[in-house]
C-alpha cells in the first residue's frame, strides 16, 4: 500500500472512530481547536470529559482525556494528555499516563481511544470508591458529632441547674450554721454550770460533717500487730475528736479485708482552704511547697516520731478551694498536755524519761535537716508498749507551715483568728509568731526547755510567768539542781550558745537521771503540793541508796588490765554466758557535768556506728554503790523499796526502742483506755502515777542567778559512787602507734591508710566527725585490720543535711560546734584558732589523716626529731623534710600535700579522696572493687590493660549453647505452630504494601546504622543494648530508627531527600542472651527548605495511605499535636523541668494502656504533677477536630496563652489545611495530650495513628525532630542552613499481628460456610503464599519429569516448588501444604503409563481436579492465576463496597429480600467493549439505591439500571405499559441518540408485565434517582 492510500485509510478510520465516540460520550466529547506554532488550527485534537460513576454519591473524581491524532493514526501512537483533574493526585495522573502509553503501544493499528477512555474511567471508578467512603464517613461523623453536642448541651444545662440548686442549698446551710454558732456563742457568754459547757462542747464537735469515706491515690503501707506489711487505699471516718479554726482531727479506720487491720485506728487531719487567694498562681505555688514538705516528711520512720503515712490534696467538690488530708499515727492515750491537765506535774524521773524520748526524736529530725518548729505539749503524744509508756513527737514541720500560710492569707473565714502557742514574752529571741518560719534547730531546743518547765511545774506555769525574766527569777531556782542547769542552757538568749539535741542527750541528767544527783532542798513545788497517787513516795536519795546486784561482777570475768586514762581504766573480760572476750571501759562519773557529758558523748557516738573498721560497741550501763557509813544507815529503810527496781541503764541504738530503755518510767496504765471517753474528766481514766523518785527535798536555792553558772556538788560528800561500764569489741593490744615506729612496707601502708579512710568516710556520711584522730586511737585486730576507736571528742557535724530538700530550714550561720580539740600534733589548724565564731567540719579529720600518713612514710630516730619535723610540716608552706623518702611526683607526696592544706576548702573530703586516682589500687580480694573503679574511668593508665584482658577471654561453649535459649519465646499474639509459618510470609506482604506507598512519594531506601556510640537521650530503664569495643568505647545497638538517622543527618551534608528504612531495632533480653530484634519501618523527609508545613503534611498523607493500604487498619484515626503546646500545658500544670521526661512518658499512655484516672494516679504517686494542678489535667483530655480543639485551648488560657502555643496553633492550622487539600481518608483529630518520645520531637509537630478496632492500639508515631538533629550536630561542622527532618515509624510486628487477627476474623466467618479452603478465599490477595504451585508425584518418584515441568514454570515467572519424594496420596499433599497458601498441586505421572503425557492439577481453592497436557500446563496456569487475580480484585472491591454500605445494610433485612438487578445498556450486554466492570459498578450502584426503599415491598423485587438524565426519569413517571401514546410522546421528546434506548426500555417493561410482575424499580445510575414503576 502506497503512502497516499495509507493516509486515506487512516483518515477514514479516524472519521469513523470520532463518529462512534460522539455517539458514546455525547456531550462529554469535545473537539478542541488548537493553534500550532505557525498559528494554524489543528483539527485533530479531542477532549473526553470523564468522571467517576457512583450509585449512592455524586461524582467526586474527574479528569479530561485529551487526544491529539496524527495523520498516520492509528499506525502512529496519538499524543495523550490528562488535564483538569479533580480529587486526583498528581502521582495518580503520572501512574495513569504510564498505563495509557503502554496500552497505546499495544493497540497500534487499531482504534484505541475508547479503550484508553475505558481505562481512565475504570481507575476513576476505583478512586471514587475510596473517596466516597471517606466523604460518607465524614458526613456520618458530623451527624454523630451534632447529636453528641446536643446531648452535651442538655447535660451542661442540667449540671448548671444542679449547681445553682446546690449553691442555694449551701447558702441556706451556711446561714443555718451561722445561726447555730451565734446561739452557741451567746449561750457560752451566759453563766452556766461546767457540765452544761461540756455538753455544748460535745455538740459543737459533732457538728462537723464527715465524708462517708476518703480515698487515697497512693497505697498506704503499715505494719500490723504481727509486724506484717499490709496496704490499703481507703479510710472510713469514725468520729471527729477535735475541730479548730485551722483543721479538723478525725479518727478513721482503714477499709480493708485484712483481719489484722480491723482494730487499727489512725488520725486524719483535714484542712479546708477556700479563700480566693489559694486559687491564684502564688497561692498554688505555696501549696506546692507544702506538698514537697509533706512528701519528705512521710518517708520518715522512727520509733519516737509519730509517722505521717500519707497525704492528699483535692479540689473541693462544691465551689472553689482545696481540701488537704494528712493521715497520721494515732495514740489512744494522752497528749502531754492532757496528762498535765490531769496530774498537774510529773516527778523528776518521769520528766527525765520523757525528755530522753523528746530529745531522741529531735535528734533524728535534726540529723535529717528538719526543724520541728512547733514543739509544745499538744504535739507530744504518749504511747503504750508492754508495761512502759513513752513519748513521741507529732506534727513536726508541716503544722507550723500551715499556720504561717494561714497567717499570711487565711484559709477560710473562721481561720482568721488563731490562738498563739506561746505567750509573747516567751518566744525565742530569734523569731516571733509571724516569723516562725525562720525557726531553726536551736529554736526547738528553746521550746524543749519550756516543755521541761511545764512537766516539772505544770502546764499553767508559762501563763503565770509569761516572760523570760520571770522564769529565770522565780521558777528556775526552785527546780532540782541539774534541771536548773539544763533549762538555763536551753533558754540562752544567744541561740549559738544553746546545746544541740545530741549534747543534751549526753548530759547526765538525761542519760543517768538522778543517779549522780545530790539531794536537793525542798522548794515551792513540794511533795505536799502534788496530788498523791499510790501512797506515800520515798525520796530520790532513798531510791539511790538501796542495795543492788552488780551486773559487771555477775556477767563478766575480769582477765587482764589493758590501760588507764584520766577517768578510768580498760580491762579485758570474758563473758560468762557466751564465753567471748570483750573490752570493758570503766569510767568513774564525777560531779562535773561537762566531764560526764564528754564521757556520755563517746557512748552516744559509738551507739550509732557499725562498720568493719570501727570499734564495735555493744552496750553500757551504770552501777552505783554507797560508802559503808551511808549503806548502814540506809539499809534499814531500803527494805520498803521495790525489789524489782534496777538502776542499770542500757544505751543501745538511739534510733530503736529497746525493751529496757524506759525502765525508769513509773507511769502505769490499767487495762484498756477508752478513746471515746471525755479527756477532760480526771475520773474517766484508770491511770496511776507512782512518784517513786520524789524527794522531800526537790529544789535547791541557787544563790547565783547567772544563766551560765551551773551548780556542782561533789558526789563523794554524799557517800555515793557511780561507775559507767562500756562493753566494746576486744582488739589485740596493738595500735597503729605501736607499729608506726618501725618501717612499714609501702603496700601495707596503703592498705592501712585505705581502711582508715573508709572508716572516716563512713562516720562522715553519718554526719559526724572524730576530731581526735591519731595513731593511738587506731587499733589493729588479730588480722592487722584497722579498728577506729576512742570517740571521746567525736561530735555531730551539724552542717550535715540533705541538700535536695529545699524546704528544710538551713542552719543558722552563727551556730557553734564544740570547741574541744585533740592532740596538738595531729589537730587541724582551724581547731587551734582562738578566734570566736571559727567554724569547722569533717575536713579537720582529713588534716589529722595527712599527719598520720606522713608519719607512716617517715622514720624518726628520736621523739624530739619526730616532734620537730611534724611541727615543720604543719606550717602553712607545708615544708617537707629533705629526708622524705618519696619524690614530689609520688602518690604519697601528693596525698599528704593536699591533706595538709590550711584552707579546709582545698582539702578533699574522705569520699572524694577514696574515689580519686591518688590512692593506689588495692590488692588481693579487694581488687574487684578497685577494678570496677578503673573501668569506670577511661583516663587511668590501667584502663586499656583491663580491656585487653577482658577481650582476651577464651569463649565458653556452654554460653554459646545457651545464648539463644530464650529466643523462641514469643511475646506477641502468635501462639499456634501454623501461625509461626505465616509470620514471615505475611510480613513480606505487609512490608511490600507499605514500601509501595513510600515509593509513590518518591522515597528511596537508605542504609541502616547498626552500631554507634551510646546516647544519653535514652533513660536508664529503657532496655537499650549496650556494647563495649576493644578500645573501651561504649556503643549501642539501635533502640529505634529515629536517633541513628538524626545522628547521620547531623554529621552529613543533606539536601532535600525522601528515604525509607526497613531495619531491626533491639531490646535487651531480661535474662541475658541474644537481644530481642524488632523490625521497624520508617519514612523520613530531610530538607533545608523552610516549607516545613508542607513536608509535615506530606508525611501524614503517606501515613494515611499506609492505613488505607492495609485492610486491618481501616478503622484507624490520626492524632496530631505540637510539642510546644504540650510544653505550655506542662507549664500550666506547674510540672518542673526535671520531671517532664517521666511525666510525658506516662501521659503518652492515655486512652491506650491507661485511662485518665489511672494516669492521674500514676502522676500523683510519682509526685510529677502538683496536686493543686492535677485536677486541671482533665481540661486537656479531649480529642476533637482542629478548630474545636484550638477553640477549647483558647478558652482555657484566655489572654494569658503563651506565645509559643499561639505560634504552634497557627502552624498546625496550616498543616491541617494542607491535609484537607490532600484529602486524607482517615479522621484527623487534635489531641493536646498526644505524645510519644517527647525528647525526640521537642519543638515540632507530633502525630500518631491508633487502631480504634483494637482498643486504641498505637500503630505508629512520628513527628519533626529538628532539635534532635541539632543535638548531634558537631559544633565545628555547623552551617548557617538548618537541617529539618520529619518522619514516621511503624513497628512491622504490630502491622503483621493486626493483619493476622484480620485474617482469623474472616476465617471464622467463612468457616461457617464450609468452604474447602476458607483461608485463601476469605482474604484474597492478603492470603500468605510461599508459592502458587507445588509439583509432586504419587508413589514411585519421577524426579526428571518433575524437574522438566518445574523449569518450564519458572521460565514463565510462576512461583513453584517441588516435593522430591513421592507421596502416598494427593490428599496427603494437600493437607500438609494447605497452610502455606499453595493454590495448585501438579501431580506428574510416571513414564510408561497411560497418562504419562498429562498432568493432574488440583485447584485447592475450588477443590477441583483437571487433566492438562504436559505441554499446556504453563499456559493453563497463567490463565488460572490471572483469573484468581481478577477474583481477588472483585473480592477487594466488594469488601470496600460492603464497608461503605454497612450503615444502610443494618436497617435492611437482606435475608428476607431477593433483589435481582438487571442492566439495560446502550450496547449489547455481551459486547466486549462494554466491560464487565462498567456493568458491575452500575448494578452495585443501583443495588445501593434500592436498599433504602426495599422495606416498602415485602415481595421479591426487580430493579432496572438505566442510563437516563433527570428529565427522562421525570417523563417516565407519566407513562404506563398499557398506554402506548404516553411512550410515543416520551420517545419523540428524547434526543435521537436516546430514542432506540427508550424503545428497548419499553419492550423490557412490557415483557415483565406479561410475566405477571406487579412493579419494578427503575434506577438511574447517572443521576442516582430511583422510581418504583407500576406494571399493572
From Swiss-Prot:
Annotated catalytic residues: 772
Region: Disordered, residue numbers: 180-204, 673-714
Keywords for this protein: Activator, ATP-binding, Cytoplasm, Kinase, Nucleotide-binding, Repeat, RNA-binding, Serine/threonine-protein kinase, Stress response, Transferase, Translation regulation, tRNA-binding
EC number per UniProt: 2.7.11.1
Pfam families in the cross-refs: HGTP_anticodon2, Pkinase, RWD, tRNA-synt_His
GO cellular component term of the entry, any: nucleus
Residues reported to bind ATP: 562-570, 585
Coiled coil: none
SMART domains, A to Z: RWD (SM00591), S_TKc (SM00220)
Subcellular location: Cytoplasm
UniProt-listed Gene3D superfamilies: Anticodon-binding domain, Bira Bifunctional Protein, Domain 2, Phosphorylase Kinase, domain 1, Transferase(Phosphotransferase) domain 1, Ubiquitin Conjugating Enzyme
Family: Belongs to the protein kinase superfamily. Ser/Thr protein kinase family. GCN2 subfamily.
Quaternary assembly: Homodimer; homodimerization is important for kinase activation by uncharged tRNAs. Interacts (via N-terminal RWD domain) with gcn1 (via N- and C-terminus); this interaction stimulates gcn2 kinase activity in a gcn20-dependent manner in response to amino acid starvation.
The protein's name: eIF-2-alpha kinase GCN2
Native source species: Schizosaccharomyces pombe (strain 972 / ATCC 24843) (Fission yeast)
Gene: gcn2
Amino acid at each position: 500500500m502506497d503512502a497516499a492510500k495509507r493516509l486515506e485509510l487512516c483518515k477514514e478510520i479516524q472519521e469513523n472512530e470520532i463518529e462512534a465516540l460522539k455517539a458514546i460520550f455525547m456531550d462529554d466529547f469535545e473537539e478542541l481547536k488548537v493553534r500550532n506554532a505557525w498559528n494554524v488550527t489543528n483539527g485533530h485534537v479531542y477532549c473526553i470529559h470523564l468522571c467517576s460513576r457512583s450509585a449512592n454519591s455524586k461524582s467526586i473524581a474527574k479528569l479530561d482525556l485529551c487526544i491529539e491524532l496524527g495523520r498516520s493514526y492509528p499506525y502512529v501512537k496519538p499524543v495523550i494528555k490528562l488535564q483538569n483533574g479533580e480529587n486526583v493526585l498528581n502521582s495518580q495522573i503520572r501512574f495513569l499516563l504510564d498505563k495509557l502509553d503502554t496500552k497505546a503501544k499495544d493497540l497500534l493499528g487499531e482504534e484505541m481511544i475508547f479503550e484508553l477512555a475505558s481505562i481512565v474511567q475504570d481507575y476513576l471508578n476505583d478512586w471514587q470508591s475510596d473517596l466516597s467512603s471517606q466523604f460518607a464517613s465524614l458526613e456520618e461523623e458530623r451527624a454523630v458529632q451534632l447529636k453528641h453536642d446536643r446531648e452535651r448541651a442538655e447535660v451542661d444545662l442540667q449540671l448548671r441547674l444542679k449547681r445553682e440548686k446546690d449553691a442555694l442549698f449551701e447558702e441556706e446551710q451556711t446561714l443555718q450554721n451561722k445561726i447555730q454558732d451565734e446561739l452557741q456563742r451567746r449561750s457560752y457568754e451566759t453563766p452556766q454550770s461546767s457540765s452544761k459547757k461540756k455538753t455544748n462542747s460535745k455538740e459543737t464537735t459533732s457538728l462537723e460533717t464527715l465524708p462517708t469515706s476518703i480515698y487515697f491515690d497512693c497505697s498506704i503501707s503499715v505494719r500490723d500487730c504481727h509486724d506484717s506489711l499490709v496496704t490499703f487505699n481507703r479510710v472510713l471516718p469514725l468520729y471527729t475528736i477535735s475541730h479548730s479554726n485551722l483543721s479538723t482531727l478525725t479518727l478513721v479506720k482503714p477499709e480493708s479485708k485484712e483481719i489484722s487491720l480491723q482494730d487499727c485506728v489512725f488520725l486524719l487531719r483535714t484542712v479546708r482552704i477556700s479563700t480566693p487567694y489559694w486559687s491564684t498562681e502564688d497561692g498554688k505555688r505555696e501549696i506546692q511547697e507544702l506538698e514537697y514538705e509533706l512528701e519528705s516528711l512521710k518517708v520518715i520512720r522512727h520509733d519516737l516520731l509519730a509517722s505521717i503515712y500519707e497525704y492528699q490534696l483535692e479540689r473541693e467538690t462544691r465551689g472553689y478551694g482545696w481540701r488537704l488530708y494528712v493521715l497520721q499515727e494515732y495514740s489512744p492515750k494522752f497528749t502531754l498536755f492532757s496528762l498535765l491537765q490531769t496530774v498537774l506535774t510529773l516527778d523528776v524521773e518521769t520528766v527525765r524519761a520523757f525528755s530522753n524520748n523528746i530529745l531522741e526524736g529531735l535528734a533524728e529530725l535534726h540529723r535529717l535537716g528538719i526543724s520541728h518548729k512547733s514543739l509544745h505539749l499538744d504535739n507530744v503524744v504518749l504511747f503504750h508498749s508492754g508495761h512502759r509508756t513513752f513519748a513521741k513527737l507529732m506534727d513536726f514541720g508541716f503544722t507550723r507551715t500551715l499556720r504561717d500560710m494561714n497567717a499570711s492569707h487565711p484559709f477560710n473565714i473562721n481561720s482568721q483568728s488563731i490562738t498563739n502557742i506561746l505567750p509573747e514574752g516567751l518566744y525565742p529571741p530569734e523569731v516571733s509568731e509571724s516569723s516562725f518560719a525562720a525557726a531553726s534547730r536551736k529554736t526547738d531546743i528553746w521550746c524543749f526547755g519550756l516543755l521541761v518547765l511545764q512537766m516539772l511545774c505544770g502546764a499553767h506555769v508559762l501563763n503565770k510567768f509569761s516572760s523570760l525574766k520571770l522564769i529565770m527569777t522565780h521558777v528556775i531556782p526552785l527546780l532540782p539542781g541539774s534541771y536548773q542547769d539544763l533549762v538555763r542552757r536551753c533558754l540562752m538568749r544567744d541561740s549559738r550558745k544553746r546545746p544541740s539535741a545530741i549534747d543534751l542527750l549526753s548530759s547526765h541528767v538525761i542519760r543517768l537521771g538522778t543517779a549522780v544527783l545530790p539531794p536537793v532542798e525542798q522548794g515551792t513545788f513540794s511533795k505536799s503540793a502534788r496530788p498523791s497517787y499510790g501512797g506515800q513516795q520515798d525520796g530520790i536519795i532513798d531510791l539511790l541508796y538501796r542495795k543492788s546486784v552488780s551486773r559487771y561482777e555477775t556477767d563478766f570475768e575480769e582477765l587482764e588490765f589493758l590501760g588507764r586514762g584520766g577517768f578510768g581504766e580498760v580491762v579485758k573480760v570474758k563473758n560468762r554466758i557466751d564465753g567471748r572476750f570483750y573490752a570493758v571501759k570503766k569510767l568513774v562519773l564525777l560531779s562535773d557535768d561537762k566531764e560526764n557529758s564528754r564521757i556520755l558523748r563517746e557512748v552516744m557516738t559509738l551507739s550509732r556506728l557499725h562498720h568493719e573498721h570501727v570499734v564495735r560497741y555493744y552496750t553500757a550501763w551504770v552501777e552505783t554503790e554507797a560508802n559503808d557509813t551511808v549503806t548502814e544507815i540506809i539499809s534499814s529503810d531500803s527494805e520498803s523499796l521495790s525489789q524489782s527496781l534496777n538502776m542499770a541503764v542500757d544505751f543501745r541504738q538511739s534510733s530503736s526502742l529497746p525493751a529496757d530503755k524506759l525502765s525508769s518510767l513509773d507511769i502505769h496504765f490499767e487495762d484498756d483506755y477508752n478513746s471515746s471517753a471525755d479527756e477532760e474528766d480526771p475520773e474517766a481514766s484508770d491511770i496511776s502515777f507512782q512518784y517513786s523518785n520524789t524527794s522531800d527535798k526537790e529544789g535547791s536555792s541557787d544563790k547565783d542567778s547567772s544563766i551560765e553558772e551551773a551548780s556542782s556538788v561533789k558526789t563523794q560528800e554524799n557517800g555515793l559512787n557511780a561507775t559507767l561500764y562500756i562493753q566494746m569489741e576486744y582488739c589485740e593490744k596493738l595500735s597503729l602507734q605501736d607499729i608506726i615506729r618501725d618501717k612499714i612496707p609501702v603496700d601495707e601502708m596503703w592498705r592501712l591508710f585505705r581502711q582508715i579512710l573508709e572508716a572516716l568516710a563512713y562516720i562522715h556520711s553519718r554526719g559526724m566527725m572524730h576530731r581526735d584522730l591519731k595513731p593511738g586511737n587506731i587499733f589493729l585486730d588479730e588480722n592487722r585490720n584497722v579498728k577506729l576507736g576512742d570517740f571521746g571528742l567525736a561530735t555531730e557535724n551539724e552542717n550535715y543535711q540533705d541538700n535536695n530538700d529545699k524546704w528544710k530550714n538551713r542552719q543558722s550561720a552563727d551556730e557553734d560546734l564544740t570547741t574541744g580539740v585533740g592532740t596538738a600534733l595531729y589537730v587541724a589548724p582551724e581547731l587551734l584558732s582562738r578566734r570566736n565564731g571559727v567554724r569547722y567540719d569533717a575536713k579537720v579529720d582529713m588534716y589529722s589523716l595527712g599527719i598520720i600518713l606522713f608519719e607512716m612514710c617517715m622514720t624518726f630516730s628520736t621523739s624530739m626529731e619526730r616532734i620537730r619535723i611534724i611541727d615543720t610540716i604543719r606550717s602553712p608552706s607545708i615544708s617537707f623534710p629533705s629526708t622524705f623518702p618519696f619524690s614530689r611526683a609520688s602518690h604519697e607526696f601528693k596525698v599528704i600535700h593536699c591533706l595538709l592544706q590550711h584552707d579546709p576548702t582545698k582539702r578533699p573530703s574522705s569520699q572524694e579522696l577514696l574515689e580519686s586516682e591518688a590512692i593506689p589500687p588495692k590488692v588481693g580480694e579487694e581488687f574487684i572493687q578497685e577494678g570496677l573503679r578503673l573501668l569506670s574511668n577511661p583516663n587511668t593508665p590501667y584502663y586499656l590493660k583491663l580491656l585487653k584482658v577482658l577481650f582476651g577471654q577464651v569463649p565458653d561453649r556452654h554460653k554459646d549453647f545457651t545464648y539463644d535459649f530464650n529466643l523462641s519465646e514469643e511475646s506477641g499474639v502468635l501462639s499456634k505452630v501454623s501461625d509461626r509459618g505465616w509470620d514471615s510470609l505475611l510480613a513480606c506482604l505487609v512490608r511490600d504494601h507499605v514500601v509501595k506507598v513510600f515509593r509513590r512519594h518518591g522515597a528511596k531506601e537508605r542504609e541502616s546504622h547498626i552500631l554507634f556510640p551510646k546516647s544519653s537521650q535514652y533513660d536508664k530503664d529503657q532496655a537499650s543494648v549496650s556494647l563495649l569495643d576493644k578500645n573501651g568505647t561504649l556503643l549501642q545497638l539501635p533502640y529505634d530508627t529515629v536517633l541513628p538517622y538524626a545522628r547521620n543527618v547531623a554529621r552529613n551534608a543533606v539536601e532535600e531527600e525522601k528515604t525509607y528504612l526497613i531495619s531491626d531495632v533491639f531490646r535487651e533480653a531480661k535474662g541475658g542472651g541474644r537481644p530481642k530484634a524488632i523490625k521497624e519501618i520508617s519514612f523520613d523527609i530531610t530538607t533545608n527548605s523552610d516549607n516545613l508545613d508542607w513536608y509535615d503534611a506530606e508525611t501524614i498523607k503517606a501515613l494515611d495511605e499506609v492505613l488505607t493500604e492495609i485492610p486491618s487498619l481501616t478503622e484507624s484515626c490520626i492524632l496530631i499535636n505540637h510539642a510546644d503546646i504540650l510544653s505550655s500545658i506542662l507549664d500550666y500544670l506547674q510540672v518542673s523541668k526535671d520531671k517532664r521526661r517521666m511525666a510525658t512518658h506516662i501521659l503518652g499512655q492515655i486512652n491506650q494502656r491507661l485511662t485518665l484516672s489511672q494516669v492521674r494516679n500514676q502522676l500523683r504517686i510519682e509526685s510529677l504533677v502538683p496536686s493543686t494542678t492535677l485536677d486541671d489535667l482533665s481540661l486537656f483530655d479531649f480529642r476533637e477536630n482542629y478548630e474545636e480543639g484550638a477553640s477549647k485551648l483558647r478558652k482555657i488560657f484566655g489572654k494569658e496563652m503563651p506565645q509559643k502555643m499561639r505560634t504552634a496553633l497557627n502552624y498546625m492550622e496550616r498543616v491541617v489545611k494542607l491535609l484537607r487539600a490532600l484529602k486524607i481518608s482517615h479522621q484527623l483529630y487534635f489531641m493536646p495530650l498526644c505524645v510519644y518520645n517527647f525528647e525526640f520531637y521537642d519543638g515540632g509537630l507530633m502525630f500518631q495513628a491508633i487502631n480504634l478496632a483494637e482498643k486504641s492500639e498505637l500503630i505508629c508515631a512520628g513527628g519533626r525532630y529538628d532539635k534532635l538533629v541539632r543535638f548531634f550536630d558537631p559544633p565545628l561542622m555547623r552551617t548557617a542552613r538548618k537541617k529539618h527532618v520529619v518522619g514516621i515509624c511503624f513497628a512491622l510486628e504490630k502491622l503483621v499481628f493486626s493483619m493476622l487477627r484480620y485474617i482469623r476474623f474472616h476465617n471464622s466467618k467463612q468457616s461457617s460456610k464450609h468452604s474447602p479452603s476458607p483461608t485463601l478465599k476469605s482474604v484474597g490477595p492478603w492470603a500468605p503464599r510461599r508459592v502458587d504451585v507445588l509439583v509432586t508425584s504419587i508413589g514411585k518418584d519421577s524426579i526428571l519429569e518433575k524437574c522438566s515441568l518445574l523449569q518450564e514454570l519458572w521460565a514463565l515467572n510462576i512461583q513453584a516448588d517441588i516435593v522430591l519424594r513421592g507421596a502416598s496420596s494427593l490428599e496427603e499433599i494437600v493437607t500438609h501444604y494447605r497452610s502455606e497458601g499453595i493454590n495448585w498441586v501438579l501431580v506428574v505421572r510416571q513414564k510408561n503409563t497411560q497418562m504419562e503425557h498429562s498432568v493432574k492439577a488440583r485447584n485447592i481453592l475450588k477443590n477441583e481436579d483437571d487433566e492438562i497436557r504436559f505441554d499446556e500446563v504453563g499456559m493453563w496456569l497463567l490463565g488460572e492465576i490471572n483469573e484468581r487475580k481478577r477474583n481477588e480484585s472483585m473480592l477487594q472491591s466488594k469488601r470496600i463496597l460492603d464497608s461503605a454500605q454497612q450503615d444502610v445494610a443494618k436497617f435492611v433485612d437482606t435475608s428476607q429480600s431477593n433483589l435481582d438487578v438487571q442492566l439495560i445498556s446502550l450496547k449489547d450486554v455481551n459486547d466486549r467493549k462494554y466491560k464487565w466492570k462498567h456493568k458491575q459498578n452500575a448494578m452495585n450502584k443501583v443495588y445501593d439505591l434500592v436498599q433504602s426503599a426495599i422495606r416498602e415491598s415485602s415481595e421479591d423485587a426487580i430493579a432496572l439500571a438505566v442510563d437516563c438524565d433527570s428529565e427522562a426519569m421525570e417523563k417516565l413517571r407519566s407513562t404506563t405499559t398499557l398506554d402506548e401514546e404516553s411512550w410515543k410522546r416520551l420517545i419523540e421528546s428524547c434526543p435521537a441518540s436516546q430514542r432506540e434506548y427508550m424503545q428497548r426500555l419499553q419492550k423490557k417493561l412490557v415483557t415483565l408485565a406479561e410475566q405477571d410482575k406487579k412493579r419494578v424499580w427503575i434506577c438511574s445510575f447517572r443521576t442516582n434517582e430511583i422510581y418504583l414503576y407500576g406494571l399493572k
